[in-house]
Design a protein with these regions (language model features):
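Active-site and adjacent substrate-binding regions of carbohydrate-active enzymes
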Residues: 1-493
Length: 493
């Protein structure tokens, strides 16, 4: 059992940065070997190429005239020019790789090189909508949610059957995405077409991150689009319950990751998703609410945590280096990386990048690495790998109070990773801005029959403990504010 360590890359900006750094135009089929070596050193299992698909001219035009986006470009890239704006990679005109990124052949070559280095490739699947430039808007308008006439959330397209008004994609709590066209999952033909499209994507990668996956749930979709009725009877059942098995029948190891919110995560897991976003964990960590983190993790079913995607950053969120000081950043990073499930790291996170670039940009400002953040992730990733974290089953542990009237144990996160016979690793973090103490119970087979050496993989610290003591009381922990330790235990024979 492995727990994926995924690295998200902004493909368009990354290739542009690489080209500048190496003094020549680089595409997916000419990525330098040094990139693969660095990913191996970090221990990644999957690369997520965010934004690899084709956007159209209308999407780029809309991205260049939106006032809110223009303000963001001005703040981040003063003096930006039209070529710096590629349009939203989630306004997809075609699920093909543009020549500027290396084309389909470049993607195939890149995937082969990833496999040769032991990595797997994730790509985007945006099931809720397509870009306004997609040919289906003209050729297959019945696949989209439609309005009988002009509407604020719709746009006009000319089709062989005359003009139609198609709804823009949206989620029910925000304004429509005006560069998109909303697919209609009440229609059986739409579902079949999207399943077939997903099959073509699955033939070119090893997994997909499904954008806003909960919007397709029948209850959510019916509520969102009640004012745009479908003339046909709604198809029964959930789309994901049909599409995921269809893909896995052809590609059994294919990975499905859902961007999901609103408490819909477990429902999507039960419909077949391997992993779903854990936004509640992210929110509690960024809020600095250690007790809330512990409560969320311990009250969640173990299978839910192990089927969740844990992160401190992604392309939608602010940079963690700008949100947390170094000490809480380190404790939060260890929490995310030490949990069972999928662990997601974002390009720039490991070097302390602070600028959050809108996804419409194909260029971003250069940021020198922050040595302290680089060292933080170098140390954590190396120590976790040495301790076997990310391999095999893991167990969240409820800490016990160190003594009466000491509530500081409520801020501790404890994760036990059994290793080879007679070894285990305990990941510990104190998510409080003050020192804390607790006892860590250790549900380890034959614990009391051995004496143990516990070495902290983040320092030179080590301890001898007797098995009966650990069995009876647990491991005593006394950590400073935002302290963290990774104890690897072996028998002391």
């Amino acid at each position: 059992m492995t727990h994926p360590l995924v690295y998200e890359i902004n493909t368009r900006c990354w290739l542009r940065d690489l080209s500048i750094r190496h003094g020549r135009c680089l595409t997916l089929d000419t990525v330098p070997e040094t990139e693969f070596s660095e990913w191996q050193r970090r221990g990644f299992t999957h690369l997520w190429l965010m934004g690899v698909w084709t956007t159209g001219p209308r999407a780029r035009e809309l991205a260049q005239c939106d006032p809110a986006l223009i303000a963001a470009y001005d703040a981040l890239l003063p003096g930006w020019r039209a070529p710096d704006i590629g349009g939203s990679p989630y306004s997809i005109a075609a699920y093909t790789v543009p020549d500027a990124l290396g084309g389909e052949a470049g993607l195939q070559s890149f995937r082969q090189r990833l496999h040769a280095h032991g990595f797997r490739l994730l790509l985007d699947f945006v099931p809720n909508h397509l870009g306004v430039d997609h040919p289906w808007t003209r050729e297959q308008p019945d696949r989209f949610v439609q309005s009988p006439g002009p509407a604020a959330a719709a746009f006009r397209v000319t089709t062989p059957a005359g003009d139609r008004w198609l709804a823009h994609g949206k989620d029910p709590y925000f304004a429509p995405w005006t560069d998109t066209a909303q697919l209609d999952y009440r229609r059986a033909e739409t579902r079949a077409a999207l399943t077939a499209l997903l099959q073509t994507i699955a033939a070119r990668c090893d997994g997909v991150r499904c954008d806003m996956a909960m919007l397709l749930l029948q209850e959510v979709f019916a509520r969102t689009w009640a004012e745009f009725p479908c003339p046909d009877a709604a198809s029964p059942g959930e789309f994901w319950a049909e599409a995921i098995p269809a893909v896995k029948k052809q590609h059994p190891d294919f990975l499905f990751l859902a961007e999901a919110y609103w408490g819909r995560e477990r429902q999507l897991q039960l419909l077949g998703f391997d992993y779903t976003y854990d936004k509640q964990l992210y929110d509690e960590l960024l809020r600095g609410h250690g007790a809330g983190v512990q409560e969320h993790l311990l009250q969640s079913a173990p299978e839910y945590v192990a089927s969740s995607a844990h992160f401190l950053e992604n392309h939608d969120e602010l940079r963690v280096a700008g949100a947390l000081a170094l000490a809480p950043h380190r404790a939060a990073a260890l929490t995310v990386l030490g949990l069972p499930g999928l662990r997601l790291l974002h390009e720039g996170q490991l070097t302390g990048a602070r600028y959050h670039a809108p996804v419409q940009l194909t260029r971003r400002p250069a940021e020198p690495p922050v040595p302290e953040v680089v060292a933080l992730y170098d140390q954590l990733l190396a120590a976790l790998a040495r301790g076997g974290v990310g391999r095999g089953p893991a167990q969240l542990i409820a800490p016990r109070a160190a003594w009466p009237a000491n509530p500081t144990h409520r801020h501790f996160i404890l994760v036990l990773w059994p290793g080879a016979p007679d070894t285990f690793t305990l990941v510990t973090a104190n998510l409080a801005p003050h020192p804390g103490q607790c006892y860590a119970p250790l549900p380890v087979a034959d614990l009391a029959r051995r004496n143990w050496i516990l070495r902290d993989l983040l320092s030179e610290e080590w301890h001898h403990r007797t098995g009966p003591e650990l069995q009876t009381r647990g491991l005593y922990l006394d950590l400073p504010a935002y302290g963290a330790q990774i104890f690897h235990a072996e028998p002391d024979d």
